[in-house]
């Protein structure tokens, strides 16, 4: 959705379809259509953001944000908004830190929400992470989720299995600075 009118229409349709009075978080899912990854939609994103601001001001959402936005994309919104994005949801996991974006978001008061903290399962068999996890008596998944949290982002792991969901919540431990440095060095 890359126009003000479509953004308004789809927000209203979403509210009707889910049957709720408000949504906790409403995002622009990407700065470009998925069929045109990397294309420049700056003007269109600014239009959509204006609709997002209105949606927020109406009380139909508690928070508004962006997803998969680069520093350039974020700055375009910041320079043309009355209300700054509250969240930037980005892919974030051990080996994929996106430090420039996370630092920029933090400096501008934007919460980074890290999706795929388990790298869509790819890091679950990583031996180095497994050794660190064993040291804390935790699973690789728990260390991976905790890592994202300690990097200052809100981890957003996906699971439909009750045991994994409970495990993803059970991250009340601290990874040492040395171990964070080891995890930072992984690719």
Locate each region found by the language model.
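Intrinsically disordered low-complexity regions specifically enriched for long asparagine
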Residues: 1-2, 26
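Short, acidic/polar
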Residues: 3-18, 72-74, 96-97
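CE4/NodB-like, metal-dependent polysaccharide N-deacetylase domain
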Residues: 7-28, 54-58, 110
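Beta/alpha (TIM)-barrel catalytic core signal, keyed to glycine-rich beta->alpha loops juxtaposed to Asp/Glu
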Residues: 30-187
């Amino acid at each position: 959705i890359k126009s003000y009118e479509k953004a308004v229409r789809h927000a209203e349709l979403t509210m009707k379809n889910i049957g709720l009075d408000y949504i906790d978080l409403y995002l622009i899912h990407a700065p470009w259509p998925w069929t045109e990854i990397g294309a420049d939609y700056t003007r269109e994103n600014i239009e959509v953001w204006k609709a997002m601001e209105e949606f927020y001001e109406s009380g139909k959402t508690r928070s508004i944000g962006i997803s998969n936005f680069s520093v350039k994309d974020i700055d375009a919104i910041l320079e043309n908004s009355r209300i700054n994005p509250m969240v930037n949801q980005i892919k974030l996991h051990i080996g994929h830190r996106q430090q420039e974006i996370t630092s920029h978001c933090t400096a501008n008061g934007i919460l980074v929400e890290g999706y795929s903290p388990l790298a869509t399962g790819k890091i679950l068999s990583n031996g180095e992470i497994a050794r660190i996890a064993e040291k804390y008596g935790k699973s690789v998944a728990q260390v991976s989720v905790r890592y994202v949290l300690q990097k200052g982002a809100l981890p957003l792991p996906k699971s439909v299995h009750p045991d994994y969901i409970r495990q993803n919540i059970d991250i009340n431990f601290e990874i040492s600075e040395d171990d964070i440095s080891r995890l930072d060095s992984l690719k």
